[in-house]
C-alpha cells in the first residue's frame, strides 16, 4: 500500500461568505482542490479527502425549517442534513476530481456517506460549539433567538453571528472498513465529511 494522505477541506473554504452560497460557487471552489489532489496523485500517494460542512448544513437545516414553517413539510433532522451535505459536497468534489482524472484513466474518485459513533454523554451535546449556516447581524440573531429560544449563537470571527450545534468527539468511523477497501482498490475516497 502506498503512503496514505488525508486532505481536509474546510466547509468555509467552499462557501466563503453569504454571497458565495450557490452550488455554482461551491463547484468553482472545489476545482482548486481537485488540481491539488491531481498533483499529489502524481507523487504516488493514496488519498482520502474529508470536508467540513458548517455553512452547507446550516443552510440545509434552515431551508428545511422554513419549508416546515411555511408549507407544513416534515422537518429534516440535523443528522439527515449532515448526510445530505456529505452527498452534495462529495458529489461536487468527486465530479471535479473525476473530470481531471479522466484523461489519465487510472484512478476514480468515490464518495462514501459516513457515520461516526459518538458517546451519548459527550459534553458537546450540552454545550454546542459548532457554527453552522449563514452569518447574521445582531438584529437578525435577536429575531431568530426570539422565534427559536432553544437555538444558540456565537459571534464568528468578526463576520457576524452563527447558530451553533453539538459537535461531539467521534469515537469510530462506521464505514472505515469500506473506505479502506476502496483505497486498496485504487479509489480516491471522499468521506467522513461534516
Regions found by a protein language model. Give the residues of each.
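N-terminal glycine-/serine-/threonine-rich phosphate-binding loop
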Residues: 1-50, 59-66, 77, 181-186
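Short beta-strand segments
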Residues: 8-10, 50-51, 110-115, 191-193
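Ligand-binding beta-strand-loop-alpha-helix segment within the catalytic cores
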Residues: 67-189
Amino acid at each position: 500500500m502506498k503512503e496514505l494522505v488525508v486532505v481536509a477541506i474546510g466547509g468555509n473554504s467552499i462557501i466563503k461568505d453569504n454571497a458565495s452560497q450557490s452550488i455554482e460557487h461551491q463547484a468553482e471552489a472545489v476545482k482548486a482542490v481537485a488540481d491539488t489532489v491531481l498533483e499529489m496523485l502524481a507523487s504516488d500517494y493514496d488519498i482520502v479527502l474529508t470536508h467540513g460542512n458548517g455553512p452547507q448544513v446550516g443552510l440545509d437545516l434552515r431551508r428545511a425549517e422554513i419549508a416546515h414553517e411555511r408549507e407544513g413539510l416534515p422537518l429534516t433532522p440535523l443528522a439527515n442534513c449532515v448526510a445530505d451535505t456529505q452527498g452534495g459536497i462529495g458529489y461536487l468534489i468527486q465530479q471535479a476530481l473525476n473530470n481531471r482524472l479522466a484523461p489519465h484513466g487510472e484512478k476514480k474518485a468515490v464518495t462514501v456517506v459516513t457515520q461516526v459513533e459518538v458517546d451519548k454523554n459527550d459534553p458537546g451535546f450540552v454545550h454546542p460549539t459548532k457554527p453552522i449556516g449563514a452569518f447574521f447581524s445582531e438584529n437578525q440573531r435577536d429575531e431568530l433567538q426570539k422565534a427559536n429560544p432553544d437555538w444558540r449563537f456565537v459571534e464568528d470571527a468578526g463576520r457576524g453571528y452563527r447558530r451553533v450545534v453539538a459537535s461531539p468527539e467521534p469515537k469510530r468511523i462506521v464505514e472505515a472498513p469500506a473506505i479502506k477497501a476502496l483505497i486498496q482498490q485504487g479509489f480516491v475516497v471522499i468521506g467522513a465529511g461534516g
